[in-house]
């Protein structure tokens, strides 16, 4: 019976199409001059001159007018012919201008009446949403929002409510191009997948978004710990942003927002399209993941306004850049044109989100001074991800990490550091860490979160190309260990000896891999003393000192 129901659901999903407006929408969806250059222009401000804000996806869903326009414009965008340079297929989901244009077109198609004006008003300040994958979901809701889960949805539009293909569930290739997509079996699938479940349908497996939800939720504690460390101790833009910079400069602090971002690619895809670098942008999740990453970068910039991009050599060839060529803030960001005369955007010209006509609620300067915003964000960072988590764990475990008579609190942050060649294996892989012996079933490691007395304590995900670019770039990532030590009741003076005895790691690609086969792999454990003043929201970090080498 369950199998029959599954097949019926698949049949309904296959039959569902885009929204039917009752008119030919090809001319509306296409740009007026398909032969002209695609120029990335700033989106317009509101009538009162303010910069519209990008909302979190659950916040947008609460506004039915904006939500309808978002789903309808996503659906229309995905429906554009793959031959069009402005189609989802060719742009692969990173061009917000098209969504804004389509939202305004669709708003104008609603029949006259109160709702039509509400849709037109919503379209004026329409901006892409983000999904906040660093915050726990509201009570009673799934961590991975349920708007991604269902293949079909009932959607209101200018012609009333219709059952359509959910544009957040997948992108359907039209036509499927097996030659371009290269990887087997992904090349044979007609739509993007997440955690493809071949037990239901082998030729065209369904996406298992329940598995994606469980695995991503298991990674939330380490994501929040890593973000707290990044936002409280990384003051250099290159170090914060780039997973190749620290190794190239022989730095001791080896994390980056790029490395944290890799977690959502690997575990949001789980062997589906998000897991593969060249295919990831086809998945609708890519768009919301990268707007969230953009938000985090914007928040860090507001906290560190004087730090900016330093010159760095390109790690591999691209269509316009040779390996080893120095890239700096004035280097053209091809293929993104800023004007019809052939001028490209640069890091300098795109430094602020306002240059593109949007901001975030957390970075909006309306009615604020920059220093006031910086202080506000310092408090928010601690509230979102921060040090109170350590202090709470410490109190609950009965471990005092500082003198009670002191106004300051101290603890030692232990961190596992990974250095590895970006093309060490043929594509993505992960390094799993354990306190004690790992489970013999490596298929369980991705979902393990250290609860229920299992030994798994975290993962460093490596989102990488297969071995075809000739890159010899070394990259890095980290895993904070302190929370796992506190949860196990390890006294501060015993931490180092405990880690020497118990800390283990395993490498997992498509299956378990011998570490000796992983090019450039180096793992050590370092620690830093952290001070938290009683009246401060900002931890002060001591020098990071290497204590042991796990693999070299």
Locate predicted features.
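Cleavable N-terminal signal peptides of Sec/SRP-targeted secreted and luminal proteins
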Residues: 1-17
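C-terminal accessory segments of proteins
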Residues: 17-552
């Amino acid at each position: 019976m369950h199998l029959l129901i599954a097949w019926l659901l698949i049949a309904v999903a296959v039959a569902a199409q885009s929204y039917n407006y009752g008119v030919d929408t090809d001319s509306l969806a296409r740009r007026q001059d398909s032969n002209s250059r695609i120029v990335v222009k700033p989106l317009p401000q509101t009538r009162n001159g303010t910069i519209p804000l990008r909302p979190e996806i659950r916040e947008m869903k609460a506004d039915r007018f904006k939500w309808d326009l978002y789903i309808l414009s996503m659906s229309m965008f995905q429906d554009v012919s793959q031959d069009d340079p402005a189609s989802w297929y060719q742009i692969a989901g990173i061009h917000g201008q098209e969504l804004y244009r389509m939202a305004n077109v669709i708003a104008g198609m609603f029949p006259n009446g109160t709702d039509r004006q509400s849709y037109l008003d919503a379209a004026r300040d329409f901006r892409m949403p983000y999904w906040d994958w660093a915050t726990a979901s509201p009570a009673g809701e799934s961590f991975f929002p349920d708007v991604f889960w269902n293949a079909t949805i009932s959607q209101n539009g200018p012609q009333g409510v219709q059952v359509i293909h959910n544009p957040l569930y997948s992108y359907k290739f039209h036509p499927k191009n097996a030659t371009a997509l290269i990887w087997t079996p992904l090349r044979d699938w007609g739509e993007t997948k997440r955690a493809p479940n071949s037990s239901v349908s082998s030729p065209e497996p369904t996406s298992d978004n329940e598995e994606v939800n469980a695995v991503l939720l298991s990674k939330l504690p380490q994501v929040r710990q890593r973000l707290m460390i990044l936002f409280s101790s990384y003051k250099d833009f290159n170090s914060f942003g780039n997973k190749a910079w620290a190794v190239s400069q022989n730095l001791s602090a080896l994390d980056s927002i790029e490395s944290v971002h890799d977690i959502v690619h690997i575990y949001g895809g789980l062997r589906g399209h998000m897991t593969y670098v060249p295919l990831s942008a086809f998945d609708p999740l890519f768009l919301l993941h990268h707007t969230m990453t953009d938000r985090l970068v914007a928040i860090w910039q507001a906290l560190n306004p004087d730090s900016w991009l330093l010159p760095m050599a390109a790690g591999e060839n691209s269509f316009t850049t040779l390996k080893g060529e120095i890239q700096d803030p004035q280097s053209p960001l091809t293929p993104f044109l800023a004007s019809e005369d052939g001028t490209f955007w640069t890091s300098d010209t795109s430094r602020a989100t306002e240059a593109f006509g949007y901001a975030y609620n957390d970075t909006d300067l309306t009615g604020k001074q920059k220093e006031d915003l910086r202080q506000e964000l310092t408090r928010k960072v601690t509230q979102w991800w921060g040090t109170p988590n350590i202090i709470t764990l410490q109190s609950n475990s009965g471990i005092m990490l500082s003198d009670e008579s002191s106004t300051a609190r101290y603890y030692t942050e232990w961190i596992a550091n990974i250095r590895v060649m970006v093309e060490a294996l043929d594509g993505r892989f992960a390094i799993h860490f354990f306190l004690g012996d790992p489970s013999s079933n490596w298929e369980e490691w991705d979902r393990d979160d250290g609860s229920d007395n299992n030994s798994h304590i975290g993962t460093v995900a490596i989102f990488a190309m297969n071995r075809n670019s000739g890159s010899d770039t070394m990259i890095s990532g980290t895993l904070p260990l302190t929370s796992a030590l506190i949860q196990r009741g390890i006294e501060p003076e015993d931490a180092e000896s405990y880690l020497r005895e118990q800390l283990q790691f395993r490498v997992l690609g498509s299956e378990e891999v011998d570490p000796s086969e992983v090019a450039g792999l180096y793992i050590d454990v370092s620690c830093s003393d952290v001070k938290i003043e009683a009246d401060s929201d900002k931890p002060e970090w001591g020098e990071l000192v290497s204590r042991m080498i796990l693999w070299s």
